[in-house]
Amino acid sequence: MSMTDLLNAEDIKKAVGAFSATDSFDHKKFFQMVGLKKKSADDVKKVFHMLDKDKSGFIEEDELGFILKGFSPDARDLSAKETKMLMAAGDKDGDGKIGVDEFSTLVAES
């Protein structure tokens, strides 16, 4: 399964392009622009599992830096600042990683 099986390729392209400048990433706007906010809880979980590259059941900080590439392979990496801000927004229990429920909450709050 690929991201375009769940989300519109044109929406992904526009969203990735909107945040092409370093330190411009806004997860709330991004999740809305790619159409993730409108998806079912099941589809949000499928996206989480695609972003969890090492299949640990969590998105760790190193994976989080590549989150845009999870949507589009030619997208940029997040800056260290953006990665830390996204982790702070998503890591509700403070364990240094984002679980599937935390990711679902992060998307729902956007």
Swiss-Prot record:
Please tell me whether the keyword Repeat is annotated for this protein: yes
In this chain, Ca(2+) 2 is annotated as bound at 91, 93, 95, 97, 102
Detail which positions bind Ca(2+) 1: 52, 54, 56, 58, 60, 63
> What Gene Ontology cellular-component terms does the record carry?
axon; cytoplasm; synapse
- Domain spans labelled EF-hand: 39-74, 78-110
Q: Which domain of life is it from?
A: Eukaryota
Keywords in alphabetical order, please.
Acetylation, Calcium, Metal-binding, Muscle protein, Phosphoprotein, Repeat
SMART domains registered for this protein in UniProt: EFh
- Thermal dependence of activity, per record: Thermostable between pH 4.0-9.5. Average melting temperature (Tm) across all pH values is 72 degrees Celsius. Lower melting temperature in acidic pH 4.0-5.0.
Q: What role does this protein play?
A: In muscle, parvalbumin is thought to be involved in relaxation after contraction. It binds two calcium ions.
Copy the domain comment. AB domain, comprising of helices A and B, is involved in structural stabilization, protecting the hydrophobic core of the protein. It is required for high-affinity binding of Ca(2+) and for Mg(2+)-binding.
The family this protein is said to belong to: Belongs to the parvalbumin family.
Q: Write down what this protein is called.
A: Parvalbumin alpha
Say which species the protein is native to: Homo sapiens (Human)
Its gene name is PVALB
